[in-house]
Amino acid sequence: MFSPAIDNLVAQLTRLPGVGTRTAHRLAFHLLRAPRDEALELASALQEAKERVRFCVDCGNWTEEETCEICRDARRDRSVICVVEQPADVLSLELTHEYRGLYHVLGGALSPLDGVDPEDLRIDELFRRVESDGVVEVVLATNPNTTGEATASFLADRLRHRVRVTRLASGLPVGGDLEYADEVTLGRALSGRREV
């Protein structure tokens, strides 16, 4: 419809989650109207993040160091690990200011239909941390959808004889993602977590 360069930009923007064709066009036109320096700064920031940000060797959260800021924080409660699917979930929970333990990012959820099995996730790393780090509680904070519930059930079955296993309380919408829940809802869910 437009020039090949604009069509390509729109196509690339639609690859972002939640960005449809109409939004991609708006973003593309905004970037084209913006001063050249502004567009180049955005491109540079994206490139820098892709080059510098990696996964924490301990928990799997995003970091620029070998170990993330949360894992390095001596004030955190090291006896509790909150298990989440993605690094974005860590941010969502941190914004509640209700949780002071550590995290473990699985990198997804079990989904046999999609070919995601336990060995495809950071589950063995979680078991090693529980065994060696003096963990007394694991909070299962996977998404309240089919794959998240299946993952929580799988982990609970394998952990409940070793440590206390809790699940976030209800209040989170079934079928929703933690990333989109507000701080109050997440805070209540954390405070009201239950044994599994």
Please provide the spans of the model-predicted regions:
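Long C-terminal interaction/binding lobes of large macromolecular proteins
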Residues: 2, 99-100, 127-196
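Short cysteine-rich clusters marking metal-coordination/redox-active sites
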Residues: 56-59, 68-71
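Extended, structured, electrostatic nucleic-acid-contact surfaces
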Residues: 1-17
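Extended interfacial segments that mediate partner engagement and assembly in macromolecular machines
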Residues: 24, 72-142
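Short metal-coordination and nucleic-acid-contact micro-motifs, chiefly zinc-binding Cys/His arrays
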Residues: 49-52, 64
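Short functional micro-motifs and their immediate structural scaffolds
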Residues: 63-65, 76
